[in-house]
Amino acid sequence: MRKQSDAMQEDMPKEKTVPVRKSTLILLFCLCGVLAVGTGLGIYRNYAGNTEYRELRQLAATVKQNYYTDVDDEAVMQGAMKGYVAGLDDPYSQYMTSEEYQAYQTEEAGQTVGIGVTVTQTDEGYLQVEEVNADSPAEKAGMQQGDILTKVEGEDLAELGYAGALSKIRGEAGTTVQLTIQRNGDTLELDVERQNIEVTTAEGQMLDGQIGYIRISSFKGNTPEQFQAIYDRLVQDGAKALIFDLRDDGGGLVSALEKILDPLLPEGEIAIATYRDGTTKTLVESDATECSLPMTVIVNGNTASAAELFTASLRDFGKASVVGTQTFGKGIMQVTQSMPSGGALTLTVATYQTTKGECYHLSLIHI
C-alpha cells in the first residue's frame, strides 16, 4: 500500500517503499508556502529553445502532423507536464491539473465535500475503507470498514489514479455519487449523498491520573484551532502531563505545525530549511510562551514529515520523550506553485531539521 505524500509542504504531503497513501476523503478522505506565482509557461518557453529539447519539439511536430485524428493540445500538454515531473523519480513532486489542485487545496484546508470515510490506497490502486464516520453519508448508505472502493460512476478507480479518484468521488454538496465496492468477495453498488464535512485532525481526552491525551492525525489548515481548543481544555482541567499521539500521521502544512508547537516550546528559532545552494531559511519559530508539563510523543513507522518535525522539535529541545517504533524518515520539504493553466506544481526544494539536531531524511527518528 502507498502512503499519501502529505509531503511536508512549505507550508510543509514514501521513499524507500512509499507507506500507505492516506487521506481524509470526507469522503474524511497534504504552504504557508503555496506560492501563487504564474511563471510556468514562461519557463517552458525558455526551455523549449534549448537544444536538449529539440527531440521533444520534433516528437510534438510528428504527432501533430501524423496522428490519425485531431490532437487535444490541452490534454497532451497536461500529460507532458505530468511526465516531466514524473521524470524526477521523486514521489513527493507532482504536477496537478486544475481539478486536482482544487481538490488538494480543499483537503489541505481541512474542509471538504465528501462521503465521510477514511481510506488507504491499495497496491492495485483501489481505495480501502479504514474508518466510517458516525452519522456520515457513507454510514447511512451502508458502507463498512474494510470495503474496497473499485469504481465511481462506473469508472475504474485504479485507472483514474489517486487524485483523480478523490476528485471524482468528491463533488458538489447535495449531489449523489454511485460507488462500486467489494466486500467479502461480493460486489455491491451504493448511492451516497455528498455533504460538506470538516475534517477532524486533532482530538483528545483526559486519561486516568490527569494525563492529557491529544491525537493529531495530520497537520491541516484547521488543525491548530482544533488542537488549541483541546490543549486549553486539558490544561484548564488540571492535566499533570501530556501525551501526543502521532502514529500514522503522514504530515501536512508547516504553517499548521508552527502554530501547534508555539505554546509548547521556548522562544526562538525551532527549525530551518536548507536549499541546494546551501542557504537556509527559518521554518518554525516560537514566542515566549512555553509548556512546563511533562510531555511524551507516540510514533510509528507511518509518522512522517511534519509529524516527524513535531516529534524531533519536542525531543531536541528537551521537552518530551518519544516512544513507539522508528519513524518513516522524511526530512525534505515541498512547495506548491500555481500555474497559468490553473494547475499547480508541487516540487521538493529543501531538506529540513531542528536547530538543535541533524536532518533525519532517510535516517529515521529512532526510539
Could you tell me what each predicted segment is?
Residues 14, 43-48, 130, 139-141, ...:
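Cleft-lining beta-strand/loop regions that shape enzyme active-site pockets
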Residues 29, 66, 110-151, 155-159, ...:
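PDZ/PDZ-like domain segments forming the peptide/carboxylate-binding groove
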Residues 1-57:
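Gram-positive cell-envelope targeting signals
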Residues 58-66:
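Acidic/histidine-rich, surface-exposed loop or edge segments in extracytoplasmic proteins
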Residues 365-367:
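Conserved small/polar residues in nucleotide/adenosyl-binding loops
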Residues 67-128, 176-178, 184-191:
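Extended, small/polar residue-biased N-terminal targeting/export presequences
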